[in-house]
Amino acid sequence: MKKILLIEDDSNYIWHIKNFLQRKGYHVLVAFTVSQGKELIEKEQILIIGSDLKLSDGSGMELLEYLREKTYKIPFLFFTCYDKKYYEKEALEKGAKICMNKLQFDLVKETLLEYAYKESNGEGATFHKILLVKKNSEITSIIQTELLKKGIYMIMVETIWEAEDKLLEYQDIELILCDLFLQDGIAMDFFHSMKKLAGIYQNTKEPIFRELPFFISLIIKIYL
């Protein structure tokens, strides 16, 4: 089975990403240096690579160049604290798929998950995102894992404030599922807030907020 390779010298940061991806059913390898990364690339079957830009013995850019020299067609994703203007153009020209802000932790781990899903399910595999606004529980985590097998990633939040933040962060969410009663209001508060924001941006060339299908329930049942 192909594995996800993460290359990062911050052991605490990489542990959390590794743990997240393993819970979604993926095998994950970790390297802390450029040399360790090269060794694993040669030894293992790699699905995708996520790497920091600056490493203790070199640069993630060096790894990207190594892949191209070897003609390995492995999707390569950067996550780093460096401003994109200093490296993104070069990285994309050399074949990187995407460059992410390391501090946007949720975005990093969910983007890695999306690329891993698409790569493991073949070219053209669809990956849909829905937003669940509901108090977290064991059952919601189980539902999230099962939906992922069908190419649906459920982003889970517990408050209206968090939900609005996610909608601004992820432009590709397709549907909202929402409990009636939430910690900071009720579902209708969120619904009207969403409609208001969508109305503000509807006439812009590239709206950053749009109205989405919205479902409200006291208990959400999903049959798989």
Task: Place the predicted regions along the sequence by residue.
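Non-catalytic signal-transmission and effector/linker regions of two-component phosphorelay proteins
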Residues: M1-L5, F105-K129, K134-Q144, W161, ...
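Conserved sequence signature across two-component system core domains
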Residues: I7-E8, A31, I49, V133-K134, ...
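Two-component/phosphorelay signaling modules centered on CheY-like receiver
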Residues: D10-Q36, S137-M156
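Helix N-cap/capping motif at the beta->alpha junctions
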Residues: V30-E39, G60, M156-D165, A187
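Short amphipathic alpha-helix used as the core "switch/output" element in two-component signaling
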Residues: E39, M61-K73, M188-F209
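Active-site beta3 strand of CheY-like receiver
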Residues: E44-G50, L55, Q171-L177, L182
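Two-component signal transduction core modules
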Residues: I49, F76, C99-M100, I176
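Alpha4 helix (beta4-alpha4-beta5 surface) of REC/receiver domains from two-component response regulators
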Residues: E62, D83-M100, D106, M188-D189, ...
